Structure formats: structure tokens, C-alpha cells
């Protein structure tokens, strides 16, 4: 049996604004489009308001003090960080009626009425802080001239496992405060999976430290990783990866929104040779002088050179279109095909 203990908590209203949020979400471009449904499915199951207070030791303190008779609350000036459990209200704090939130005066003028005040000991839920991210980077409250130009924030890149938390609560806060969509674009990527197709997690012990993969090959260092498989622990090894090979692998391995397998051995086998070939092509091309006029094509080119320039322009057009649509996979695959196949052969 589970014993249910009723405790008073702080909540943010959210059930009343769900329809308006859906309207605002329609203004956001999702990448891939299908992953918008993750968010909508979660919203379909919201039936209560958002409990934002937690009983923990470490996090952002809820900036509230209570009067002795608990009929009033004291709040600090906007933007002030306080620790109510150990500090008194700072200068400029205001007193509100607890039931109506009516502002009834300054803390300094009402100290006798309030009696012995008590500071809130609870802290905010972690997503209460994290949902400020788009507002913060856009200059909300601090840089209004920038905020007017920068909001809605251009892009939110994130994984699909936190759509119901980070993405949803960020959009909720933007809707409540500003009645605007929180972003112009939302990029929802897949999850990193182990070689057996399982999500990497601490509980399974099947994770691979990214720093060790990036350092593999630097200064002659080799990489070795012990990964817990379904039946036994497997030792994976690689000699040369590094940051550039790692980036190329991630860009080429999966389309946006798809899960991707992380196996250092395969990263080295598939992409180190590709990276080396691209480097050699670039080094060969760098031996020649850059023409003064890159916009016009010389009249005396042979048919093979005219063909490769046509192919190059087609590649650049496709790459620019892909980048504009935040499709890194298509852009990188197109460059890889041209840079390791068509151009070297020419």
C-alpha cells in the first residue's frame, strides 16, 4: 500500500490556456514536422495545474515570506535573488494579500502588522528555471531593445525525451507572460543508442563519455570503452577519431529526429577515411591560385570542367536549401558525395 500525504504546494495555472497554446504552437516550425505530435500528445493528457515547488536542499529558492497570521505574503523586487529561509526581505519588498494577491503596501511600512515573518523553505522545480532559457538569451526585461528583435527565439534544439518538460514548460511560460510562441523553430532530435539499439543511460551502464571519443587519436592516444551489453560487457577500441571525425559522423549518421547508434569502432571505420579524403582534396585544391573573378566562368573551359562547375552549382544549391531548412543530414551527405566521389574523380 502507498500512503498519500497531502501537502500544500505552489502551482502555476496551465489548464485554462491549453487551447491558446495549441494556436501558438501552430506558428512554430518543427524539425522534423512529425515530432510536433510528441508535444500535442503530452498536452492532451494535462488535467491539473503545474506544481512548481519542491522539498529539496539545493535549487532556486521560492522568494516568498509569510506573515505571522499567514494572511499576507512578502515578495522581493523583481529580479532580486533571495534566500528566504536565512534572509529578511530586502528593501523595496511588497506585501500582498495571500488570497487575492492584492498589493497592500511596502514591507517597511507594514512590519508591525505582519508580526514575526517566516521565510519559504521550498525551492522551485528544475523546469521552472529551465523554462526561462529562451527569455534569458533574448534579453527579456534586461535588454528590451534587443528582446523586441530577438523574440520569439530563433531555434530550440533538444532531444525528444524532454519534450514534455523543457519544451512544454518553456512554451507555457512564453504563452502566460507574453501570449507569443516561444520559438520560430523547434528541432527535436533522436536519442543516442548503444551498439545493441538501447538508449544510453546510467542505470544500464552502457554510456560512452563523449570527451574520451573526442580525445581519441590526439597525441597518439587510443580509445578503449567498456560497455555493458544485454548479455556481457564488451570492450570497444578505436585509434583515431577526434572532434572533426566525430562531427562528420553525427551529421551523416541519422536524419534529424531519428535515433542514432554510438559505436566508436564504427565511427572510426566509416568516417575517418572519409575525413582523410576530404582533407586531401582540400589540400590539393589549395595549391592553386584563387581566380580574381569567381562570378564569371572563363570561355575557354573544356567540357569536363564546365560539367564539374555545373555539378558544383547544383550541390551548392541543394546544400543551401538544406541548411535553410535546418536539414544538416542532407547538406552533409550531399557535400560528402561530391567531395569524396564526383570531384576527386574529375
Where are each of the predicted segments found?
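Structured secondary-structure scaffolds
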Residues: 1-291, 308-346
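Aromatic-rich surface patch/π-platform used for binding flat ligands and interfaces
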Residues: 305
